[in-house]
From Swiss-Prot:
Catalytic activity: ATP + H2O + a folded polypeptide = ADP + phosphate + an unfolded polypeptide
Enzyme Commission (EC) number: 5.6.1.7
PROSITE patterns: CHAPERONINS_CPN60
Protein name as it appears in the record: Chaperonin GroEL
Organism classification: Bacteria, Pseudomonadati, Pseudomonadota, Gammaproteobacteria, Enterobacterales
Subcellular localization, as worded in the UniProt entry: Cytoplasm
One GO term describing the cellular component: cytoplasm
Keywords: ATP-binding, Chaperone, Cytoplasm, Isomerase, Nucleotide-binding
GO biological process, one term: protein refolding
Known function: Together with its co-chaperonin GroES, plays an essential role in assisting protein folding. The GroEL-GroES system forms a nano-cage that allows encapsulation of the non-native substrate proteins and provides a physical environment optimized to promote and accelerate protein folding.
Database matches in PANTHER family: 60 KDA HEAT SHOCK PROTEIN, MITOCHONDRIAL (PTHR45633)
Gene: groEL
A Pfam match: Cpn60_TCP1
Length: 548
């Protein structure tokens, strides 16, 4: 086992504090509308330019092991805030830095660290309650657009696109962010259910100009098996031909003789057919087939429940207003499934989301809900260069997380104002002893730090602006973009309650642990390898230097 280096008391805390400040100082330059960028060097390719706090934090590793421990703990604050609300990482870092700095001053002055922590925790619990009271629901498109704009660093186009996307696919819909091909940001909305499986044969194409298959009011046959024998399909094909409607077959696979016969029938115009593979694999495929069945009002033909393909009739098939199939995707528009059945299925999947343990499963289940309930919107980010594209994409993703958080828990006045107001409400809060009261004061003073940092980044004097904001009331605050005072809600400067709450809770949690640190242990740096010349026996080798 490697030898350890151990530091106690003030020695340990000073080193840790230095690490905290290095990381926090790098992150906090990005806060607010006039925050600057940070350039991150990459081992290959162009450097990354970002204004995203957590991206900066993740890049920082310090040489000194003790300082690095401090930096890593603050990194944890940013990561946790990012995981919980998807935004507010810089605010969380600024709060943590302030609590740690003020808290360690109090420890150095002889206060009891455990009581300080209890005081900080008490103040944060009270602050979260007050934040919830200040919170107003965020339901209309205008408020959603404002939240998106603020989170995307005052980029109004992004805010409006996110609001439009939420309007189109609903609050529960899936909105994904992709790299676009042009200079402009675009929004693509896919209504209906779309899955990533295209036609099994190009001979099914009936719209050569778009290279797609379009079926109007088709019957939809869903089979949880491979179909290779045409005899299994004949009864279905005859019934559909009599009904005079097209047919879409969604099965595990359609191959060999069965596929060839379908192609021949289509080309001769006997019956309009298209076949696609079922989406997903294994159990997920079964579940997605069932989703399509619920959406279209059909039944999945599965041998597991004793159903045979030969005996399937028109009553077992789903129907939709229209189906569009391209090389890679199939979109089912306006399925004829019953509303009650669809909402029941959505509720069932939501329950599975709550029980899911992995993020991947949760994401896939969320996609299924969206496909059943709303639709899917794709935000395509436009930029002139790849470096700008990466930076902008990260900002758009942040803005999207922020708007989701706003819809979930509402919004409060932005620009650091909500925390200043909350701190003012808690001036009468008291702990069980004087040390706890100091802890409460530490937390309340830290709540001003985001506002101070926003003002500082805008090149103004933090104390002057903070006092002016404190003298006001309600949503009165300072707009760093235009350098004027007024109602933050009217300015359209809103922060999601969830983002502000998460930032405060995680900052206080980690900062409290750092204040109560008394000892730090790390591996000793490995010394240089011992010089072979010092071994005695090989000393005579020194004379070989002349042979070079």
């Amino acid at each position: 086992m490697a030898a350890k280096d151990v530091k106690f008391g003030n020695d340990a805390r000073v080193k840790m504090l230095r690490g905290v400040n290095v990381l926090a100082d790098a992150v906090k330059v990005t806060l607010g509308p006039k925050g600057r960028n940070v350039v991150l060097d990459k081992s290959f390719g162009a450097p990354t330019i970002t204004k995203d706090g957590v991206s900066v934090a993740r890049e920082i590793e310090l040489e000194d092991k003790f300082e690095n421990m401090g930096a890593q703990m603050v990194k944890e604050v940013a990561s946790k805030a990012n995981d919980a609300a998807g935004d507010g990482t810089t605010t969380a870092t600024v709060l943590a830095q302030s609590i740690v700095n003020e808290g360690l001053k109090a420890v150095a002055a002889g206060m009891n660290p455990m009581d300080l922590k209890r005081g900080i925790d008490k103040a944060v619990i009270a602050a979260v309650e007050e934040l919830k009271k200040l919170s107003v629901p965020c339901s209309d498109s205008k408020a959603i657009a404002q939240v998106g704009t603020i989170s995307a660093n005052s980029d109004e186009t992004v805010g409006e696109l996110i609001a439009l996307a939420m309007e189109k696919v609903g609050k529960e819909g899936v909105i994904t962010v992709e790299e676009g091909t042009g200079l402009q940001d675009e929004l693509d909305v896919v209504e209906g259910m779309q899955f990533d499986r295209g036609y099994l044969s190009p001979y099914f194409i009936n719209k050569p100009e778009t290279g797609a298959v379009e079926l109007e009011s088709p019957f939809i046959l869903l089979a949880d098996k491979k179909i290779s024998n045409i005899r299994e399909l004949l009864p279905v094909l005859e019934a559909v031909a009599k009904a005079g409607k097209p047919l879409l077959i969604v099965a595990e696979d359609v191959e060999g003789e069965a596929l060839a016969t379908l192609v021949v029938n289509t080309m001769r115009g006997i019956v309009k057919v298209a076949a696609v593979k079922a989406p997903g694999f294994g159990d997920r495929r079964k579940a997605m087939l069932q989703d399509i069945a619920v959406l279209t009002g059909g039944t999945v033909i599965s041998e597991e429940i004793g159903m045979e393909l030969e005996k399937a009739g028109l009553e077992d098939m789903g129907q939709a207003k229209r189906v569009v199939i391209s090389k890679d995707t199939t979109t089912i528009i306006d399925g004829t499934g019953e509303e009650v059945a669809i909402s029941g299925r959505v509720t069932q999947i939501r329950q599975q989301i709550e029980d899911a343990t992995s993020d991947y499963d949760r994401e896939k289940l969320q996609e299924r809900v969206a496909k059943l309930a709303g639709g899917v919107a794709v935000l395509k980010v436009g930029a002139a260069t790849e470096v700008e594209m990466k930076e902008k994409k990260a900002r758009v993703e942040d803005a999207l997380h922020a708007t989701r958080a706003a819809v979930e828990e509402g919004v409060v006045a932005g620009g650091g104002v909500a925390l200043v107001r909350v701190a003012a409400m808690l001036t009468e809060l008291r702990g069980q002893n004087e040390d706890q009261n100091v802890g409460i004061k530490v937390a309340l003073r830290a709540m001003e730090s985001p506002l101070r940092q926003i003002v500082s980044n805008a090149g103004e004097e933090p104390s002057v602006v903070t006092n002016a904001v404190k003298a006001g009331e309600g949503n009165y605050g300072y707009n760093a973009q235009t350098e004027e005072y007024g109602n933050m809600i009217d300015f359209g400067i809103l922060d999601p309650t969830k983002v502000t709450r998460s930032a405060l809770q995680y900052a206080a949690s980690v900062a409290g642990l750092m204040i109560t640190t008394e000892c730090m242990v790390t591996d000793l740096p490995k010394g240089d390898a011992p010089d072979l010349g010092a071994g005695g026996g090989m000393g005579g080798m020194g004379g070989m230097g002349g042979m070079m």
